[in-house]
Amino acid sequence: MKNILLAGAVSMIGTLVGTRWFIHWLAAKGYGQFIRDDGPTTHKTKKGTPTMGGAVIIVSVLLAYLVAHLVTWTHPSISALLVLWLFSGLGFIGFLDDWTKISKQRSLGLKPKGKLLGQAFVAITFAIGVMYFPDVHGVTPGSPAISFLRDISWLYLPVWLGIVWVILLIAGSSNAVNLTDGLDGLATGASTMVFGAYTVLSIWQFNQWCSRPTTAGNHCYAVRDPHDIAVVAIAIAGACFGFLWWNAKPAQIFLGDTGSLALGGAVAGMAVVSRTELLLVIIGALFVIETVSVMLQVSVFKITGGKRVFKMAPLHHHFELKGWAEVTVVIRFWIICGLAVSAGLGIFYAEWVAGQ
């Protein structure tokens, strides 16, 4: 438990302190956000705000994980390392995208093909990796089975199809958080709650772990490294919480694709290694809602030849154009996220109670 608390504290302090320095450095270099012309007109005032703040989150999380293990003299686990690879790998792709926007002074970053290839490489290596590296009990970080609260036995896929499923989950999750990151503090605050939920969930799995002699066979959880996954989850939650100090309206820095792609990938990674892939739809409901709003808007527009369901997508922009203040939209969306996270954890716990 010590390394869990230590990781959360170090990552939070890291972003609280590090982000301030990073803002000054970016401002001195003149590296700021470019605003798309087709966005809400109220966002024009945000032009020039420093971006790539996700870099501070990534560095703080990696540092926190390292410090937690060095201080407690414990070994890192393959499950945690794979999630951190997914987190930092997608973050690096996002960093290249942000850097291209800044250096070329345009609102569009990497070419779609290059960005997709980079994301695919990171996702594929993670998806393959989680299917290997069994522990002494034969449990691998991930599983070919689609999971809800545990692996679903009748949805056990061939390994190759399981890999495809994980890749699709990563693609959907990373882009969902990216779409949500459109208002000051929205994605950061929501991510804090989601990773906080995965911290609680992983700690519970560790306490009811099949590899513990006292819980084996008693409706336990067949996962590989739940304690270390909790270390990663709280490190990310802590980093997001600290970053929110600078990212809340009026934002002094944005996550950028560096942060949103990294956080989205890590959410998917958490779901895979904790065997809660379909539960992610509930815990991350806000991200799902935002994504569905875009899909619905585009589909209806194409089918009807120009009609729209919303004033603008993603959904948070729709409410902005209806006259809601940005802070109002963010807080109400946070409330939705909090309710969804609570519902997800409630379902997770209720299933365990029902099995006793």
From Swiss-Prot:
Annotated localization: Cell membrane
Top-level taxon in the UniProt lineage: Bacteria
HAMAP family xrefs: MraY
Residue stretches spanning the membrane: 4-24, 53-73, 76-96, 116-136, 152-172, 186-206, 228-248, 253-273, 278-298, 333-353
Protein name: Phospho-N-acetylmuramoyl-pentapeptide-transferase
Organism: Cutibacterium acnes (strain DSM 16379 / KPA171202) (Propionibacterium acnes)
Cofactor(s) essential for the protein: Mg(2+)
E.C. designation(s): 2.7.8.13
Function: Catalyzes the initial step of the lipid cycle reactions in the biosynthesis of the cell wall peptidoglycan: transfers peptidoglycan precursor phospho-MurNAc-pentapeptide from UDP-MurNAc-pentapeptide onto the lipid carrier undecaprenyl phosphate, yielding undecaprenyl-pyrophosphoryl-MurNAc-pentapeptide, known as lipid I.
Higher taxonomy: Bacteria, Bacillati, Actinomycetota, Actinomycetes, Propionibacteriales
Class in the EC hierarchy, top level: transferase
